[in-house]
Regions:
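Active-site capping/gating segments
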Residues: 11-27
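Thr-Gly-centered strand-to-loop micro-motif
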Residues: 29-30, 69, 133
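A short glycine-threonine-serine/GTX helix/turn-capping micro-motif
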Residues: 63-72, 120
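Hydrophobic packing residues within well-ordered alpha-helices of enzyme cores
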Residues: 1-4, 133
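Internal alpha-helical scaffold of NAD(P)-dependent oxidoreductase catalytic cores
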Residues: 3-9, 25-63, 74-112, 156
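NAD(P)-dependent Rossmann-like dehydrogenase/reductase catalytic/cofactor-binding core
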Residues: 97-163
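A short, glycine/Asx- and small/polar-enriched loop/turn
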Residues: 20-23, 68-69, 128-129
Length: 163
């Protein structure tokens, strides 16, 4: 706003890199001085690269930490799965396509059915292999680790916005 002046409608947006393949998440907002219709225009434009969510300005740093940085978290998880597959002696040439399809298929299933907890429970047999792996996630604090990563990115976004 300071750079543009009061006579210019301003839309703040936070896209992410999956927009490059039409599967992005973009958050948008405007301030009280801008014409609210400008959000309709921005949303229409940005739906070309994925889903658009209108959020309040106060939530933008959290959006940055979750969906702006989120693709890197998913890619880091993919790297970890590939490395774990290599440690389990799977052939190197199948690891990346296998993990890519795993993530793509799981995302498609989640998009089709929703309810990530229910989907996780459906694939987890009590005392089975999946339960053993998920127990490690629980014991080593996966949820806290992810929450801390999002919080750190949110804090850094706030710091960058203040400078």
């Amino acid at each position: 706003r300071a750079a543009c002046g009061d006579g210019v409608d301003v839309v703040r947006s936070m896209p992410n890199t999956p927009a490059m393949v039409g599967k992005g998440v973009t958050a948008i907002c405007t301030d009280a001085k801008s014409d609210p219709a400008v959000l309709d225009w921005a949303e229409e434009l940005l739906t070309a690269v994925g889903m658009v969510f209108r959020v309040d300005e106060e939530h933008f740093d959290a959006v940055t930490g979750l969906t702006g940085s989120g693709p890197a978290y998913v890619f880091a998880f993919a790297e970890a799965l590939i490395a774990a597959g290599a440690e389990a002696d799977l052939p190197a040439e199948v690891l990346e396509p296998m993990v890519t399809q795993l993530l793509s298929g799981s995302s498609a299933l989640l998009a089709a059915q929703g309810n990530p907890a229910g989907l996780r429970e459906a694939v987890t047999s009590p005392g089975g292999t999946t339960a053993a792996g998920l127990n490690v996630f629980s014991e080593q604090g996966l949820r806290a680790l992810v929450a801390n990563a999002v919080a750190a990115a949110k804090t850094r976004s706030r710091e960058l916005g203040a400078s």
